[in-house]
Amino acid sequence: VINAKTEAVPFLAITRPNYFSVIAVRADSGLTNAEQLKGQTLSMSDIGSTSGHLGPSKILVDQGLDPQTDLEVLMLGDAELQALKNGDVNAWGGSYIDYERFLEAEGAQESDYPILFEGEMLPSDVLMASKNLDPALVTEITEKMLANQDALIAAITSVDANQKFVGSELVAVQDSDYDSIRESYQAIGVNEFTEFVGD
C-alpha cells in the first residue's frame, strides 16, 4: 500500500522474534483439522492487523478454507482470546506472542489451548526511502544503519511500547518479501493494494 501511494523504496527491515500467527482451540473443542473448522466461529483481533487478522486469514486459505464463507470470523479486539476461554467461539486466530502471553496470564499450558495450525514467519517491519533520494545516499544510510544497528535497536527497545523488538536485527529487504501480505489481503477479499484495511 505504501508503495502504491508513494512509490517509496524499501531499503531495510527490522525483524521481530516469533512474529507469526497461529490458529488455536480449546482442548475440549474436539476440533483437530481444517475440515472441522467449517461452520465454526473463530475470533481474531482487529481488522487489518498483520498478525491478528491477515496472518490467520492466510493460514485458513492455506488450509483450504475461505475465511469469508467457510466459517464465521468475529473481530473482537483485545477480547478475542477471552472469547475462546469462555467458549463464546470455537477457535481463535492471532499472534503467537499474544498466545504465549495469554497462556502465562491464565497459568495455562499449550495442551489446554492446542495450536491447530502455525503460519509462516510474517515479514519484518519495513523502512522505506523516498523515490526522490539519490540511490547512493540510500546506500550510505543503509550501510551506516547496519554498522550501528546494536545502538539503534537498543534505542528502539528503550521504549516500553517497542518491547516486541527485543532480539531484533536490521536486515536487507526487497518488495517481493511482502508478497505474502498481498496474498493475505486477497484472503480477506481485497485485491487492490491501494488502501490500508481497518483503522
Where are these regions (language model features)?
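Short, glycine-/small- and polar/acidic-enriched structural segments
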Residues: V1-G30
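An extracytoplasmic/periplasmic, membrane-proximal ligand-sensing/linker region
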Residues: A129, L133-D199
